[in-house]
């Protein structure tokens, strides 16, 4: 951020205190151009019924980044109807461990509700089946989100993994290999359940290690929570498998 000449604004505290639209107050007061929030935050303020476009200026705001969990189609709708019509909503997916995103926003391409726009620069991102075959020509068929090639911020390894001290990239430790390369040999597997769309966008269905598999049909937990949380009596939900 600083290398590009931008100024980072960090907020410490509850984003809904003392009022639900607190972050939009900060957007106006600090002239924020890019606002990074969680998908859960967008869903929470959507359910609270706030309308920032009616109560705030938001002239400086041109990008909203959403992360942490899949952003629902209803979340996309709320941003464009209740926040700002000409904002770039960038739903992103990556990891703290790699300090990067595998898939995310592209300001040169159209945005479709419920979809991440595509792979990020420098990332050979793909969704593959159990045999490592790409699913890009099978829109809607879900598989493992992977990166087929090394990327600039690939972690070198884990501390004290197989040897004392710093990791040796020439001799990766067993925990490191198990965490990222065991599921799909030769590819970095991030642990997300994803599918391509007909627009060559990506839909994240949830964590692949929490994917339910009744009768051989794989179902992402996010698909269930989205339906459950549409009920007015449900504020939040958690889905897990039970044998």
Regions found by a protein language model. Give the residues of each.
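Alpha-helix/helix-capping structural signal
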Residues: 40-43, 153
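AMP-binding/adenylate-forming catalytic core of the ANL superfamily
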Residues: 28, 35, 151, 156, ...
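Short, P/G- and charge-enriched loop/turn segments at secondary-structure junctions
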Residues: 109-115, 178-183
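Gly/Ser/Thr-rich phosphate-binding loop
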Residues: 3-6, 32-37, 46-113, 124
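Conserved AMP-binding/adenylation subdomain of ANL enzymes
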Residues: 1-34, 48
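Conserved ATP/PPi-binding loop(s) of AMP-dependent carboxylate-activating enzymes
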Residues: 120, 133-181, 219
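Short coil-to-beta-strand transition motifs
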Residues: 115-122, 188
């Amino acid at each position: 951020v600083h290398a590009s000449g931008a100024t980072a604004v960090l907020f410490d505290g509850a984003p809904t205190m003392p009022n639900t639209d607190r972050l939009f107050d900060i957007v106006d007061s600090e002239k924020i151009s890019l606002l990074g929030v969680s998908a859960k935050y967008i869903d929470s303020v959507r359910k609270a019924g706030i309308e920032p476009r009616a109560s705030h200026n938001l002239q400086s705001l041109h990008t909203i980044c959403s992360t942490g969990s899949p952003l629902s189609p209803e979340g996309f709708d709320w941003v464009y109807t209740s926040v700002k019509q000409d904002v770039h909503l960038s739903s992103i997916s990556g990891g703290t461990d790699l300090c990067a995103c595998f898939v995310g926003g592209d300001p040169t391409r159209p945005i479709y509700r419920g979809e991440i726009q595509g792979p990020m620069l420098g990332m050979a991102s793909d969704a593959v089946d159990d045999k490592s075959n790409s699913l890009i020509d099978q829109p809607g068929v879900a598989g493992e989100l992977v990166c087929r090639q090394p990327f600039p911020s690939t972690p070198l390894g884990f501390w004290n993994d197989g040897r004392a001290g710093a990791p040796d990239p020439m001799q990766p430790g067993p925990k490191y290999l198990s965490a990222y390369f065991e599921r799909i040999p030769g590819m970095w597997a991030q642990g997300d359940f994803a599918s391509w769309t007909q627009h060559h966008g990506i839909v994240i269905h949830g964590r692949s290690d929490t994917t339910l598999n009744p009768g051989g049909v794989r179902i992402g937990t996010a698909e269930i929570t989205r339906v459950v949380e549409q009920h007015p009596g449900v504020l939040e939900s958690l889905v897990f498998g039970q044998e």
